Amino acid sequence: MKLELSLEQWQQVKDFAIRNLNLSSISKADCDLSEYIPYYNKWLENNYHADLEYMVKHGSKRFIPNELVPGTNSVIVATLNYLNRPVNVKTEVKRLRTTSNIADISIYAHGRDYHKVMKKKLQQLGEFIDELTGGHQFRVFTDSAPVLERPLAEKAGLGWQGKSSMLMNKAQGSFFFIGVIYSNLDLSKLPDSPKHQDSCGKCQACIKLCPTGAIQPGKMIDSRKCISYLTIENKGSIPLELRDKIGTRIYGCDDCQLVCPFNNYAPITTEKDFQQRDFLVNKPLLELLAWSEKDFDKYTQGSAIRRIGYAAWIRNIAIAVGNSPFNQDNIQALELKKLEFSDNQLVLEHLDWAINKQKLLS
């Protein structure tokens, strides 16, 4: 006999998630992801996954939760807002079109590493359910395994996948993390949350304003062009033809979200762990370029930024300094950094590019 939750218990779970864990929303979904297989396979066929080989591996486990975690009968899906400042589309568009010497870091990385924050909350939620039922077997995921978080959230009625492939929600916008619990509970008898209709309509804002043209038809992202991929997941050289377009974005890119009309109303997070770290936000590029590896380790402790490593961090900043308004100090700082990376050809290549770019701007 499968373990179930009563409607009253399910309400207790939702109340605990919102009130005690500060999660933004919670729902449940079944395990049938078959409708998403053609979409995913087409994305792979187009080579939009770049060199992310883990997106190819694991076979059917990505689409059949019970294969990844045997005994899974249902999926519990939760979201957690991370937006730490108001967004106004008109203001953002103007800012994004203005060149500056200030580093641009994706909002999600301003605070504590979301993997740690979200997983801790989901684990507490799973344990709370176990207290209610006894025998609750579960495993939590947040962007860390072959799990289709966005499709599962869409099935759970927490939003729709927009043209940017981000999960959208009229009330929450898109600035939220998604976490899931693969559970042995049978939640099929509980009422489903109503599905969200795709409300993007004819809007093309994210497509038109993507700096590198990474947003493709069919709600697909070409990772090979995506600045988030290029500055975070990419371990090698950033393609020459895309360097100018990266601007001063040194870690990730929020452009497709910042220009989305639904984010005009996105709520500000109340999660303390996601508040801005002063030493990462609105910082002059040269100040960050001057960091030593020891500084990098110190200031990125507990941050998702730590994952890319110091060399990639300097690689990214070099591109941004090259793209910033001309200043002789930029060239001097880049030349000085070359001494530190004299045995690292990858970083040297980007430092040299930035120096030449600054000379062209002079």
UniProtKB/Swiss-Prot annotation:
Which positions are annotated as binding [4Fe-4S] cluster 1? 200, 203, 206, 260
Cellular component GO terms, alphabetical:
cytoplasm
The record ties this protein, via InterPro entries, to:
4Fe4S_Fe-S-bd, 4Fe4S_Fe_S_CS, QueG, QueG_DUF1730
Cofactor annotation: cob(II)alamin; [4Fe-4S] cluster
Q: Which domain of life is it from?
A: Bacteria
**Which GO biological-process labels does this protein carry?**
queuosine biosynthetic process; tRNA modification
UniProt-annotated catalytic positions: 143 (proton donor)
- Stated EC number for the protein is 1.17.99.6
Q: Name one GO molecular function term.
A: 4 iron, 4 sulfur cluster binding
Check the record and name the Gene3D superfamilies matching this protein.
3.30.70.20
Which reaction(s) does the protein catalyse, per the Swiss-Prot or TrEMBL entry? epoxyqueuosine(34) in tRNA + AH2 = queuosine(34) in tRNA + A + H2O
Stretches assigned to the 4Fe-4S ferredoxin-type domain: 191-220
Keyword annotations from UniProtKB, A to Z: 4Fe-4S, Cytoplasm, Iron, Iron-sulfur, Metal-binding, Oxidoreductase, Queuosine biosynthesis, tRNA processing
Subunit comment for this entry? Monomer.
Q: What protein does this entry describe?
A: Epoxyqueuosine reductase
**What is the gene name?**
queG
